[in-house]
């Protein structure tokens, strides 16, 4: 055992224990194209085996921000990995990608094998939901950088799309219809404000039970994993009905919807066309946040916005329904005369 390293605060044995514990979770994510297992210097993936004619790789990286603080407060670490995967694969799926593989990065003050197994099990759960292989990762024990009970989590996803099938919003025109896919809650953005509003201003705890939330513990509601939209979007991409996709993350409707819309156009959104989840009403009240500002921060119950032609709107809704997914007609694309997003 490297005694000097141990005395410096880094446990090599704990690192070995983590690898041993997570192997079964990694194995669950195996999919066509994955070559070998973990333990090499790099993760391998055979792109040729998938049969793409003009493959374009699409990548994305993200973390879960201060949602980790809520996980720590609640002592619940088994789902935060799903959030990490979701934030990455939803971004690349918004460009039409089929996720292929994922790598995670965990930095911590002290290597706790049992806790890190919980985290990685969540990462594996997310990879299974997204049908992508967990082909590598890094766990960095960094005493002096983090407190012993602190850790951070980030990830990196790579997907592929046919060059001719990349979804970039360039074909969006006036009159196209905007369809919203529901979120599962706050997802993974805005948690610095969430914590300030609920825990500092309102004085709630993760164990607070509110009638507005059906009596469920506040911590459980906040830690509801970010929805992974890969399997929701796949049949829509195959049907060729989607012109553009906006993943509603940090910046809410106001910052994300314009990212898919060509210059000279704007999104007209009809308020009341979808059910706003109760957690957002609780946040707005607790933090005394202006109602319209909420749309510039949170997803407000809509995690993805799709742009489709008016002729394909009914077909899109039928495809969603046939796959057990919900969708809401939010509004349409209009000529830009003022703001990028019109909320009325």
Curated annotation (Swiss-Prot):
Molecular function in Gene Ontology: ATP binding; phosphoribosylamine-glycine ligase activity; phosphoribosylformylglycinamidine cyclo-ligase activity
GO biological process: 'de novo' IMP biosynthetic process; adenine biosynthetic process
Pathway(s) it belongs to: Purine metabolism; IMP biosynthesis via de novo pathway; 5-amino-1-(5-phospho-D-ribosyl)imidazole from N(2)-formyl-N(1)-(5-phospho-D-ribosyl)glycinamide: step 2/2
Gene3D superfamilies, per database record: PurM-like C-terminal domain, PurM-like, N-terminal domain
One Pfam family per UniProt: AIRS_C
The EC number(s) this enzyme carries: 6.3.3.1
Keywords: ATP-binding, Cytoplasm, Ligase, Nucleotide-binding, Purine biosynthesis
InterPro entries, A to Z: PurM-like_C_dom, PurM-like_C_sf, PurM-like_N, PurM-like_N_sf, PurM_cligase
Localization annotation: Cytoplasm
Top EC group: ligase
Chloroplast among keywords: no
CDD domains cross-referenced by the UniProt entry: PurM
GO annotation, cellular component aspect: cytosol
Substrates-to-products reaction catalysed: 2-formamido-N(1)-(5-O-phospho-beta-D-ribosyl)acetamidine + ATP = 5-amino-1-(5-phospho-beta-D-ribosyl)imidazole + ADP + phosphate + H(+)
Record-linked SUPFAM superfamilies: PurM C-terminal domain-like, PurM N-terminal domain-like
Matches recorded under NCBIfam families: purM
Entry's family note: Belongs to the AIR synthase family.
HAMAP family: AIRS
Protein name listed in UniProt: Phosphoribosylformylglycinamidine cyclo-ligase
Gene giving rise to this polypeptide: purM
């Amino acid at each position: 055992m490297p005694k000097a390293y141990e005395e410096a605060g880094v446990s090599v044995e704990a690192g070995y224990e983590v690898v041993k514990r997570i192997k079964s979770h990694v194995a669950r994510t195996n999919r066509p194209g994955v070559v070998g297992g973990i333990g090499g210097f790099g993760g391998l993936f055979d792109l040729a085996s998938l049969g793409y004619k003009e493959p374009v790789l699409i990548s994305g990286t993200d973390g879960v921000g201060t949602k980790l603080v809520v996980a720590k407060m609640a002592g619940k670490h088994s789902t935060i990995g799903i959030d990490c995967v979701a934030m990455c694969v939803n971004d690349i799926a918004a460009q039409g990608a089929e996720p292929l593989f994922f790598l995670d990065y965990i930095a911590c003050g002290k290597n706790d094998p049992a806790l890190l197994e919980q985290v990685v099990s969540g990462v594996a759960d997310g990879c299974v939901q997204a049908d992508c292989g967990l082909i590598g990762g890094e766990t960095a024990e960094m005493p002096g950088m983090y407190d012993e009970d602190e850790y951070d989590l980030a990830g990196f996803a790579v997907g592929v799309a046919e060059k001719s099938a990349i979804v970039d919003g360039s074909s969006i025109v006036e009159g196209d219809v905007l369809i919203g896919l529901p979120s599962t809650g706050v997802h993974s953005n805005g948690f610095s404000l969430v914590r300030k509003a609920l825990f500092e201003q309102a004085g709630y705890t993760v164990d607070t039970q509110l009638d507005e939330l059906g009596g469920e513990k506040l911590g459980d509601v906040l830690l509801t994993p970010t929805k992974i939209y890969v399997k929701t979007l796949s049949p829509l991409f195959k049907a060729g009905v989607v012109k553009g996709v906006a993943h509603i993350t940090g910046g809410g409707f106001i910052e994300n919807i314009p990212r898919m819309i060509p210059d000279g156009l704007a999104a007209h959104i009809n308020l009341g066309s979808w059910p706003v989840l109760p957690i957002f009403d609780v946040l707005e009240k607790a933090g005394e946040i202006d109602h319209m500002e909420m749309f510039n921060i949170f997803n407000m119950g809509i995690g993805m916005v799709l742009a489709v032609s008016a002729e394909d709107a009914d077909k899109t809704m039928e495809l969603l329904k046939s796959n057990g997914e919900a969708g809401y007609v939010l509004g349409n694309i209009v000529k830009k005369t003022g703001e990028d997003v019109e909320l009325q």
